């Protein structure tokens, strides 16, 4: 069994359902300290949602004047769902048909193990490496993400810590290892809209105001609106409704209000304030009586082609023969926080077809090549 596979299996055995870490970071800390890393635990969150974060750094011969390459990842995993639907224990790594099964196999314990072993090999080969290496690991990525990476970033920013490059181990590949990496992500802006009416008997509509009827034309306009055209890196901004709640459950009562949940996934071609203003203008045009609460989940971020993307692309092609595609599709990630203190942030990991699913798995044939790609990035940027 290879070192990467062994560490991956060790991490999968730990039932680290968010925000639990279940000793994953202690395993990493032991191995990193043996390499000369300085490790710092940053614990945050209320007693009923305690989050464990690890910041570990090893300075190169150039000290703080040299480049710093960080790896960011999360030890927490999503819940398993119905255990009876799994073909094996989700927390007992199991091999079938060339695949390693277990919760977190793809998202993202294989990536964490791969980078740790890559660093072990790199430090052994280059004990006097010029640049610095860091790990930013959290147990609050799959949850609300209020006390995870964002808290570490705040602490690093407060003391003036500079990151030059960051690789996030998210599972970005699609059909084969290395066919896609993420060099940015769209922003996320959510709204909870409550349109008010006047409740009454459905047979006497003149005695009330139906908020569903009043809201419908505005919702149709919002759904049809072209928010922007996107740009060379991002698709056009998308507005989608996720939930509509209205009525008492009775079929003879016009409701007093209707609640609509919606979300923007927006590109760098739009801003949160600009989107908010346009939504309010449409609602006001339809003369609705409403309240609207906004939640900004994250700003979009983008890493144009540069040292990090070039090094990663070259490492992928050297190991796999695949020419990778830079993409900004998909949901948000902790990159939205890290981009505030790091100019070059890229996500790369194994194929994502089974993440968050029953029988999550990773193909064993990709595990050590993933590690080799990570080592290739280290060799190209900080040796």
From Swiss-Prot:
Binding site for Zn(2+) 1: 74, 107, 170
Cofactors required: Zn(2+); Co(2+)
Positions of Zn(2+) 2 binding: 107, 142, 356
Record protein name field: Succinyl-diaminopimelate desuccinylase
Job description of the protein: Catalyzes the hydrolysis of N-succinyl-L,L-diaminopimelic acid (SDAP), forming succinate and LL-2,6-diaminopimelate (DAP), an intermediate involved in the bacterial biosynthesis of lysine and meso-diaminopimelic acid, an essential component of bacterial cell walls.
HAMAP family given in the database record: DapE
Lineage: Bacteria, Pseudomonadati, Pseudomonadota, Betaproteobacteria, Burkholderiales
Enzyme kind, highest EC tier: hydrolase
Species assigned in the record: Cupriavidus pinatubonensis (strain JMP 134 / LMG 1197) (Cupriavidus necator (strain JMP 134))
Gene that this sequence comes from: dapE
Active site as annotated: 76, 141 (proton acceptor)
Molecular function per GO: acetylornithine deacetylase activity; cobalt ion binding; succinyl-diaminopimelate desuccinylase activity; zinc ion binding
InterPro entries: ArgE/DapE_CS, Bact_exopeptidase_dim_dom, DapE_proteobac, Peptidase_M20, Peptidase_M20_dimer, Peptidase_M20A
Xref: Pfam families: M20_dimer, Peptidase_M20
Keywords tagged on the record: Amino-acid biosynthesis, Cobalt, Diaminopimelate biosynthesis, Hydrolase, Lysine biosynthesis, Metal-binding, Zinc
Pathway per the UniProt entry: Amino-acid biosynthesis; L-lysine biosynthesis via DAP pathway; LL-2,6-diaminopimelate from (S)-tetrahydrodipicolinate (succinylase route): step 3/3
Cofactor note: Binds 2 Zn(2+) or Co(2+) ions per subunit.
Subunit annotation: Homodimer.
NCBIfam families named among the record's database cross-references: dapE_proteo (TIGR01246), PRK13009.1 (NF009557)
Keyword Amino-acid biosynthesis (UniProt): yes
UniProt GO BP: diaminopimelate biosynthetic process; L-arginine biosynthetic process; lysine biosynthetic process via diaminopimelate
Family as reported in the entry's similarity comment: Belongs to the peptidase M20A family. DapE subfamily.
Catalytic activity as recorded in UniProt: N-succinyl-(2S,6S)-2,6-diaminopimelate + H2O = (2S,6S)-2,6-diaminopimelate + succinate
Its EC number(s): 3.5.1.18
């Amino acid at each position: 069994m290879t070192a990467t596979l062994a560490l991956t299996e060790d991490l999968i055995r730990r039932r680290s359902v968010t925000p639990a870490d279940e000793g994953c970071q202690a395993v990493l800390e032991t191995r990193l300290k043996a390499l000369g890393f300085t490790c710092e635990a940053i614990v945050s969150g209320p007693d009923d949602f305690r989050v464990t974060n690890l910041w570990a750094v090893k300075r190169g011969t150039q000290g703080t004047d040299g480049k710093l390459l960080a790896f960011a990842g999360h030890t927490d995993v999503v819940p398993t769902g119905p255990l009876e639907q799994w073909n094996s224990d989700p927390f007992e790594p199991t091999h079938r048909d060339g695949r390693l099964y277990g919760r977190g196999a793809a998202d993202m314990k294989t990536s964490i193990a791969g980078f740790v072993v890559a660093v072990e090999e790199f430090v052994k080969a280059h004990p006097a490496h010029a640049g610095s290496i860091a790990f930013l690991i959290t147990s609050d990525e799959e949850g609300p993400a209020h006390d995870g990476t964002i808290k570490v970033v705040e602490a690093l920013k407060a003391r003036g810590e500079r990151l030059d490059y960051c690789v996030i181990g998210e599972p970005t590949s699609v059909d084969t290892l290395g066919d896609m990496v993420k060099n940015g992500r769209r922003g996320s802006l959510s709204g909870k809209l409550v349109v008010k009416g006047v409740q009454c008997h459905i047979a006497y509509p003149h005695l009330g105001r139906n908020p569903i009827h009043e809201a419908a034309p505005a919702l149709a306009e919002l759904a049809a609106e072209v928010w922007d055209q996107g740009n060379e890196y991002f698709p056009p901004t998308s507005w989608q409704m996720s939930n509509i709640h209205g009525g008492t459950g009775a079929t003879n009562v016009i409701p007093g209000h209707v609640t609509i949940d919606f979300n923007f996934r927006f590109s760098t071609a739009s801003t949160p304030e600009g989107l908010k203003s346009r939504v309010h203008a449409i609602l006001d045009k339809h003369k609705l009586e409403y309240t609207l609460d906004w939640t900004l989940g994250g700003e979009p971020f983008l890493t144009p082609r540069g040292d990090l993307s070039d090094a990663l692309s070259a490492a992928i092609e050297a190991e796999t023969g695949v020419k990778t595609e830079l993409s900004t599709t998909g949901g948000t990630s902790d990159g939205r926080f890290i981009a505030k203190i790091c100019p070059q942030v890229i996500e790369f990991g194994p194929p994502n077809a089974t993440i968050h699913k029953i029988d999550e798995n990773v193909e064993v044939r990709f595990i050590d090549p993933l590690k080799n790609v990570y080592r290739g990035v280290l060799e190209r940027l900080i040796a």
